Amino acid sequence: RRAPPDAARAFVAACALSAAGTSSPPRGDRLDRLTDQLRGAAPMVATLAGARVEADGETLAWRREPGEFRRGQSPVLRLAPGETGVWDGRFEITANQALEIAPLVGRTASLAEPSARALRQVAAPARGALPALETADGLVCPLLQPTPGVTMRALALARLQAACGLVVREP
């Protein structure tokens, strides 16, 4: 809240970019308005460039806005056995078998029980933007339920650190 205006604006843009998994940072009046709103203590919810931000004076949460999937084309990642790919700019996924990852939005009722149970612990606005895939056990979210042959790594924090100049050398 006390950061210089240009630094605050750059940080808000980096947060939106990282949470949404996009490659072009937001600019313009919407970014300026959101930056100004976040300097205040009033509770607020806003979206910017595919990201959803919620603030209540105490906490600040950045998430992917799942409504973007309904408005545009949903990201689908198809992997061959042994292949690694990045889904929605937010998760690196490696698979031992062929699979297809797509957003959970609109499909939560179809989740296999272990994923459905774990999903209840996830903030409602974040649920639809989670990755999901079909397995022999049904629809699962590898972030919520161990999924044999699938490894997943979240990229948002690393992207934010890089956007803020905190990465000295990439691995």
Model features per residue range: what roles?
Residues 1-171:
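AMP-forming adenylation/ATP pyrophosphatase catalytic core
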